[in-house]
Amino acid sequence: MSMQDPIADMFTRIRNGLSAEKEFVSVPFSKIKMEIANFLVNEGYIKSCSKGTTSMGHPSIEIELKYHAGAPVIEMIKRVSRPSLRIYKSHADLPKVYGGYGVAIVSTSKGLVSDRKARDLGVGGEIIGYVA
């Protein structure tokens, strides 16, 4: 059976890895998932990400999870726009996540950016997900 929403699967693997206090999680590789992982590294939510291969030889992304004082840095990671219901917002309508403490991942014509950067650039786009 094929995977319907690979980004939601990535978020779920990260959530499950944090719940199980894993150091690393592995996700099947795609360019958009690698962009999201790099975004999470730049925002400080995960330690690192790198392209690797599974034991079967399939490309994957190895994500090193981040903890602070034994607690996961990511409290919440949630998919917003999904294949069956895409959510687009203009720069004026972009939501503030956790009152500004979290970030919305926005896919714009300028690439993947945070809600703050999208507002600064004056561009809207598809809301991929929320992280806090």
Curated annotation (Swiss-Prot):
PANTHER family: 40S RIBOSOMAL PROTEIN S15A (PTHR11758). GO terms for molecular function: rRNA binding; structural constituent of ribosome. Keywords: Ribonucleoprotein, Ribosomal protein, RNA-binding, rRNA-binding. Belongs to the universal ribosomal protein uS8 family. Disulfide bonds: none annotated. HAMAP family: Ribosomal_uS8_B (MF_01302_B). The gene is rpsH. It comes from the Bacteria. NCBIfam families: PRK00136.1 (NF001109). It holds the Pfam family Ribosomal_S8. InterPro entries: Ribosomal_uS8, Ribosomal_uS8_CS, Ribosomal_uS8_sf. This is Small ribosomal subunit protein uS8. One of its GO terms (cellular component) is ribosome. One of its GO terms (biological process) is translation. Gene3D superfamilies: 3.30.1370.30, 3.30.1490.10. Part of the 30S ribosomal subunit. Contacts proteins S5 and S12. One of the primary rRNA binding proteins, it binds directly to 16S rRNA central domain where it helps coordinate assembly of the platform of the 30S subunit. It comes from Francisella tularensis subsp. holarctica (strain LVS).
